[in-house]
């Protein structure tokens, strides 16, 4: 397969052809938690609270899978750009193997710590019980998630975005169909409640992996997974973790943030914990759409970086940034105009609806500013500059927002937590802008 179109095709058509399937994929993929939440909300408010408390753990699993997958994706694309197919094959093989090991370890550790983790945020035994029921099943599918996302990043690295889109859509459709059947016991299906939501998600994710395997066997791609390369090589492992660890931390930081904010909000009322949980369900539509553009950008940028096309790398960044700003602008308008309508998808509690609308009004003020941070972090990952990418995310999710939320909650009240979001986005955007001109901008000029 000829990969030279990555550096020859006009940037906008190339970016859209790579990114649009990923935008659709990420939009559909975000439905996993959204659909679970919509149906779980019909069980009880306690069930919705349990789901909100388990969300950081789900996000952590996904973060490790995707973060290390970013390393797989970037290294493969760089080797393909440099014409080193054998090294690309080694990266794919050893990257997949390592991510499967990650999944096994996560399952074991997760099952051990979940009771203590949930007890940190609530004394309600009903909520803890539901959280354990849901998280136990979710954790059992960790290895499948790791393998599935590894294949996703391998297919993306060779530019095969359509298969990724179809695989993710298949898993989501299976999840949507099974959710009501397993939660409420429709027909001959057992009534499993919140456990049914977790099982439906796991089966959906398994369907995605099965489709990847079928396509890989029947329609071979440019990169091969070979048993001869299963023996880990220090150089290959170092390359993968050099990008994968910062990328994983980038994606895991939101889990840490949600847990920290849950602790602050729980001191006021469980209502605010639910509001935060619903907000993160809603914002996945917005940020995963933007992330779809970035996933389309990443292999193109990595390939051109490997091919020494530095001026083209800079143009790819700017084009992606303009599109993401547009996405964030639309999200800002929607959240400002119809916040209660959005919240009502997940709850009919009047207090939750009112407080949720206030939260969305305040938080959406930082959406457009976040474009700088989001695109810059993705670009740095594509160029193998994991430390810079991690610095942006660390500022955005820890250094600014958590202290600001704590201080403002004490001085302004609970609404101060929501103001901490846009404050963090603006400060981080300024720093990301400076890093861009120091590194990517300078590289493009040279």
Locations of the language-model features?
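Helix-terminus/linker motif at the lipid-water interface of multi-pass membrane proteins
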Residues: 27, 31-49, 118-125, 181-192, ...
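Residue-level signal for short hydrophobic patches within transmembrane helices
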Residues: 8, 12-31, 35, 57-64, ...
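Hydrophobic transmembrane alpha-helices of multi-pass small-molecule transporters
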Residues: 60-63, 107, 175-180, 209-213, ...
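Small-residue-rich hydrophobic transmembrane alpha-helices
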Residues: 48-108, 145-164, 262, 275-339, ...
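Transmembrane helical elements of multi-pass membrane transporters/channels
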Residues: 17-36, 137, 171, 204-208, ...
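Short alpha-helical transmembrane segments in multi-pass integral membrane proteins
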Residues: 1-19, 76-143, 189-245, 301-366, ...
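Structural signal for membrane-spanning alpha-helices in multi-pass inner-membrane proteins
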Residues: 110, 153, 179, 183, ...
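Short runs within selected transmembrane alpha-helices of multi-pass transporters and secretion channels
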Residues: 69, 138-156, 164-172, 197-210, ...
């Amino acid at each position: 397969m000829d990969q030279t179109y990555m550096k020859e095709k006009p940037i906008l058509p190339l970016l859209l052809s790579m990114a649009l399937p990923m935008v659709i994929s990420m939009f559909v993929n975000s439905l996993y938690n959204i659909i679970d939440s919509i149906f779980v909300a019909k069980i009880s408010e306690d069930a919705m609270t349990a789901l909100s408390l388990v969300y950081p753990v789900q996000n952590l699993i996904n973060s490790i899978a995707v973060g290390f997958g970013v390393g797989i994706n970037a290294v493969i694309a760089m080797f393909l750009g440099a014409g080193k197919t054998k090294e690309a094959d080694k990266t794919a093989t050893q990257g997949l193997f390592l991510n499967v090991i990650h999944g096994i370890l996560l399952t074991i550790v997760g099952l051990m710590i979940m009771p203590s983790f949930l007890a940190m945020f609530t004394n309600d035994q009903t909520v803890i019980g539901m959280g354990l029921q849901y998280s136990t099943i979710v954790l059992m599918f960790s290895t499948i998630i790791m393998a599935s996302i590894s294949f996703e990043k391998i297919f993306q690295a060779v530019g095969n975005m359509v298969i990724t889109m179809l695989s993710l859509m298949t898993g989501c459709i299976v999840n949507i169909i099974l959710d009501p059947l397993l939660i409420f016991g429709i027909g001959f299906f057992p009534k499993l409640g919140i456990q049914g939501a977790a099982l439906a998600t796991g089966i959906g994710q398994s369907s995605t992996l099965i489709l990847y395997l079928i396509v890989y066997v029947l329609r071979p791609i440019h990169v091969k997974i070979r048993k001869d390369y299963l023996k880990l090589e220090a150089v290959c492992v170092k390359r993968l973790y050099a990008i994968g660890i910062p990328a994983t931390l980038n994606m895991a930081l939101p889990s840490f943030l949600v847990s920290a904010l849950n602790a602050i909000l729980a001191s006021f009322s469980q209502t605010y914990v639910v509001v935060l949980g619903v907000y993160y369900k809603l914002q996945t539509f917005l940020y995963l759409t933007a992330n779809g553009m970035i996933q389309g950008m990443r292999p193109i940028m990595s390939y051109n970086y490997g091919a020494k096309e530095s001026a083209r790398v800079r143009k790819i960044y700017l084009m992606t940034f303009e599109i993401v700003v547009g996405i964030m602008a639309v999200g800002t308008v929607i959240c400002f105009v119809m916040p209660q309508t959005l919240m009502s998808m997940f709850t009919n509690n009047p207090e939750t609806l009112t407080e949720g609308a206030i939260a969305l009004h305040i938080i959406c003020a930082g959406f457009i500013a976040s474009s700088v941070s989001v695109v810059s972090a993705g670009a740095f990952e594509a160029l193998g500059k994991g430390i810079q990418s991690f610095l942006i995310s660390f500022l955005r999710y820890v250094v600014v927002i958590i202290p600001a939320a704590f201080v403002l909650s004490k001085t302004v009240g609970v609404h101060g937590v929501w103001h901490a979001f846009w404050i963090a986005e603006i400060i981080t955007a300024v720093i990301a802008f400076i890093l861009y001109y120091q590194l990517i901008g300078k590289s493009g000029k040279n």
